[in-house]
Swiss-Prot record:
Role according to the record: Catalyzes the conversion of dethiobiotin (DTB) to biotin by the insertion of a sulfur atom into dethiobiotin via a radical-based mechanism.
Similarity section: Belongs to the radical SAM superfamily. Biotin synthase family.
Gene transcribed to yield this protein: bioB
Swiss-Prot/TrEMBL catalytic activity: (4R,5S)-dethiobiotin + (sulfur carrier)-SH + 2 reduced [2Fe-2S]-[ferredoxin] + 2 S-adenosyl-L-methionine = (sulfur carrier)-H + biotin + 2 5'-deoxyadenosine + 2 L-methionine + 2 oxidized [2Fe-2S]-[ferredoxin]
Alphabetized CDD domains for the sequence: Radical_SAM
The protein's name in its UniProt record: Biotin synthase
Highest taxon above the source species: Bacteria
Length: 343
């Protein structure tokens, strides 16, 4: 029987001495995962900008002047080319996002075709397209989509301070439609929106107490984009962020905890502590929308220092020439990459 986390239990985790918490998180992590492997995903924006939503952190919203260049839905050849390069760079999952409130019916056949073509390449697929109804979710699942990303962002109580054009319940309905279709769920949140510790606690409770816990949980650190209402938000204290990763690992022991947006602001030591706390997945690519992301070469160097192996590679350290091959093949157009937290 699945454990239901209570408010009091979760508060107690947050109150634990830091090293005790880290020890417990690492214990849980080792029960379910090889601590020396990491899952790598790559994201591509297949339709950029002009989103009608008012998410206060998002440069894709049409309501804010961020200088983001609008791009129509990409041609399938462009998408497949990026997917191939991502696979050659070590990614096992190719994620695609479109800046929509929800996909239009006229676009569904095209989306289904994209999924099928990428699946033929031997990669897992994930999409984030906004809210879905049950029929749309079933079509994507039938096309072979493995994961659907739809973040809760924050707690139910704080949510209306961030977004007014989509309700919290709509997000939960979408997650239910995704789960009912047979797809796997990717859902997490953003830290640094101005929320209090209580909101962080409630977000993790909401995620962990879903009928089935998300297979993938991206934890984002707010990327402050000039022109958005959150451009001047306070920075997140690194140890607070590491603590959230550790609590997420304990509460969702079998989920992949993804170190997501904001990673470019973390030094190697902070990232290493996040991995020690139970993070075992990253977004890998030159750029996350308008914000920077660690270069592939730097990521590979960090993996080597930490003896971390990409999940789709052999369980031995990559040889020097293999690293060089991956680095060489990872030169992808930087402006096509974005952060899944934006949808």
């Amino acid at each position: 029987m699945k454990k239901k986390w209570t408010l009091e239990e979760t508060k107690m985790l947050f109150k634990k001495p830091f090293f005790n918490l880290m020890f417990q998180a690492q214990e849980e992590h080792r029960k379910n995962f090889d601590p020396n492997t990491i899952q790598i995903s790559t994201l591509l924006s297949i339709k950029t900008g002009s989103c009608p939503e008012d998410c206060k952190y998002c440069p894709q919203s049409s309501r804010y002047k961020t200088g983001l260049k609008k791009e129509p839905l990409l041609e399938i050849e462009q998408i497949l080319s990026a997917a191939k390069k991502a696979k050659d760079s070590g990614s096992s999952r190719f994620c695609m996002g479109a800046a929509w409130k929800n996909p239009k019916e006229k676009d569904m056949p095209y989306l289904e075709k994209i999924i099928k073509k990428i699946k033929e390449m031997g990669m897992e697929t994930c999409m984030t397209l906004g809210t879905l109804n049950s029929t749309q979710a079933k079509k994507l699942a039938d096309a072979g989509l493995d994961f659907y990303n739809h973040n809760l962002d924050t707690s139910k109580n704080f949510y209306s301070n961030i977004i007014t054009t989509r309700t919290y319940q709509e997000r939960l309905h979408t997650l239910h439609a995704v789960r009912s279709s047979g797809m796997k769920v990717c859902s997490g949140g953003i830290i640094g929106l101005g929320e209090k510790k209580q909101d962080r606690i409630e977000l993790l409770i909401e995620l962990s107490n879903l009928s089935i816990q998300p297979e993938s949980v991206p934890i984002n650190m707010l990327v402050k984009i000039p022109g958005t209402p959150m451009a001047d938000n306070k920075d997140v204290e690194p140890f607070d962020f590491i603590r959230i990763i550790a609590v997420a690992r304990i509460m969702m022991p079998k989920s992949y905890i993804r170190l997501s947006a904001g990673r470019h602001k973390m030094n190697d030591q902070t990232q290493a502590m996040c991995f020690m706390a139970g993070a075992n997945s990253i977004f890998y690519g030159c750029k996350l929308l308008t914000s920077d992301n660690p270069e592939e070469k730097h990521d590979l160097e960090l993996f080597k220092k930490l003896d971390l192996i990409p999940e789709n590679k052999t369980q031995t350290l990559l040889k020097e020439d293999e690293y060089k091959t991956i680095i060489k093949s990872s030169k992808i157009k930087k402006d096509q990459y974005y952060n899944a937290a934006i949808i």
